[in-house]
């Protein structure tokens, strides 16, 4: 993945669905894992208002601040020269990966469940691991 923005929610549902279909697995599990510590994979409704709510809520919870002085709202992690401490915290809240059942060769999800990649510190190339296990 290469997200040009600092933060973005991107649907990866159809790509995961395609990989499951191509695998030929009829009964099993698929693991979808953000392979970076500043990104998440999660499942929820594909509704833009909800995504905007996530953005607002996470920014209120852990606001972006490139500084490293806690007295002014900065983060000690940013003393490393990075400015992405908030991204690490946001990933902890949203999680690392999802595991979805495969039944009859298809993703076994609820009617409103959709798989997303959530980038918290974009502008660089990142990977997603999709591991399909089953028969």
Question: Where are the model-predicted features located?
Answer:
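Active-site histidine-anchored catalytic micro-motif
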Residues: 1-135
